[in-house]
Amino acid sequence: MSEVLSPMTAISTKPAPRVGFVSLGCPKALTDSELILTQLSAEGYQTSKTFEGADLVIVNTCGFIDDAVKESLDTIGEALAENGRVIVTGCLGAKGGEGAGNLVRQMHPSVLAVTGPHATQEVMDAVHLNLPKPHDPFVDLVPNAFGIAGIKLTPKHYAYLKISEGCNHRCTFCIIPSMRGDLVSRPIGDVLNEARALFEGGVKELLVISQDTSAYGVDVKYRTGFWDGKPVKTRMLELVQALGDIAEPYGAWVRLHYVYPYPSVDEVLPLMATGKVLPYLDVPLQHSHPDVLKRMKRPASGEKNLERIARWREICPEIVIRSTFIAGFPGETEAEFAHLLEFMREARIDRAGCFAYSAVEGATANDIPGMLPLEVREERRARFMAVAEEVSSLKLQQRVGATMQVLVDSAPALGRKGGTGRSYADAPEIDGVVKLLPPEKISKTLKVGEFTRARIVGTQGHDLVAIPV
């Protein structure tokens, strides 16, 4: 009697090809990595965070400042040494080298392929060429199991939502437009579909990112799109309103990043005042003195920004403002720097970061006369941060005694030993945290990714200390 084999028996059990993956750089690069990983997984590739045992490695790079370039080149070198088969993508991939060459190719000529940022299809083409995708007659018939939201590299309870790519500004210290191009806004229907999918998947905090969130829709002249059968204008105000509406049934947060201080931002403040989205704005001001801002080719001026911030606080007294600044920009005088320190005290910026100016290859700021010695740039950065910490400390002290909603990020032993979380004033990774003490009630537990109420009892540096209630 002959043996009859089932179809499953006849199919090869050859393991799926494995791709090692490293993601470097900012949240915008992270979302590019998520798109690539989602596509790899949808096509049947296995992925890992290590080079060992991988059939090839993809390195998503950063090329904005010298330290980031070095880290990216070093990582590519490590991947080549440990694995030998490397595909490079990201901002460094778009960076030119000597002559008309490519920097990555010049430094690491043995890489398999090099692409710029936001190039999922080009990366997949390179993967297919060097590691043909697996064929499974059963899996090939299954739709993408990851849905619209795809694979996320963040913790499950928060996610980045990129609304556009590129930038129309030509700031003299920045080379992003040369790597990521001019502004290209995503269709508003696609953005809102992804947001809803993320909330449905359990995300409790959505962080809206881009190179210039305020300019969303400028490139398409605020074209009217459609979502859920309704017309929606491709513009920041309508986007934020819709995101708040989608988040509300889930009790989730929406946080805005990379918001240029245009007058149109004023229209969004009432949505913050009414709780539609978090009263938090990440606004990259960079400096306050009009002459420095002119050399930077930045919009607005310190005085206009002071007026705008005051107006924002009138509309929404609870607003928290985060910003980044550059100390020691070429030609910056002591008087111009003193102007920046005074601006910080007057504006009362809640959260501030500062970089000592560093020349970026390809930036037009390199041609501005008056490059300051490194020790002067670093000394000014330290002085700026001392003032920023002074302002931040006063702001944090004002919260002692208040009860705040906190999103739990860590909770060992269900929080019985305490944990950490963040209030609406704290974006992940760049701001402080709320250090949660053990709950007073034995029955009280904490769970990562859930909200809890906590009474603020003190401060520690940039952080708050609280007891869950």
From Swiss-Prot:
Residues annotated for [4Fe-4S] cluster 1 binding in this entry: C26, C62, C91
GO molecular function: 4 iron, 4 sulfur cluster binding; aspartic acid methylthiotransferase activity; metal ion binding; protein methylthiotransferase activity
Residues annotated for [4Fe-4S] cluster 2 binding in this entry: C167, C171, C174
Domain annotation MTTase N-terminal: ranges: 17-132
Cofactor binding: number and manner: Binds 2 [4Fe-4S] clusters. One cluster is coordinated with 3 cysteines and an exchangeable S-adenosyl-L-methionine.
Domain TRAM: 397-469
Pfam families referenced in this protein's UniProt entry, alphabetically: Radical_SAM (PF04055), TRAM_2 (PF18693), UPF0004 (PF00919)
Required cofactor(s): [4Fe-4S] cluster
InterPro entries to which the protein is assigned, alphabetical: Elp3/MiaA/NifB-like_rSAM, Methylthiotransferase, Methylthiotransferase_CS, Methylthiotransferase_N, Methylthiotransferase_N_sf, NA-bd_OB-fold, Ribosomal_uS12_MeSTrfase_RimO, rSAM
One GO BP: tRNA modification
Compartments reported by the entry: Cytoplasm
GO CC term (a single one): cytosol
Catalytic activity of the protein: L-aspartate(89)-[ribosomal protein uS12]-hydrogen + (sulfur carrier)-SH + AH2 + 2 S-adenosyl-L-methionine = 3-methylsulfanyl-L-aspartate(89)-[ribosomal protein uS12]-hydrogen + (sulfur carrier)-H + 5'-deoxyadenosine + L-methionine + A + S-adenosyl-L-homocysteine + 2 H(+)
Family listed: Belongs to the methylthiotransferase family. RimO subfamily.
Function: Catalyzes the methylthiolation of an aspartic acid residue of ribosomal protein uS12.
The protein's name in its UniProt record: Ribosomal protein uS12 methylthiotransferase RimO
Gene for this chain: rimO
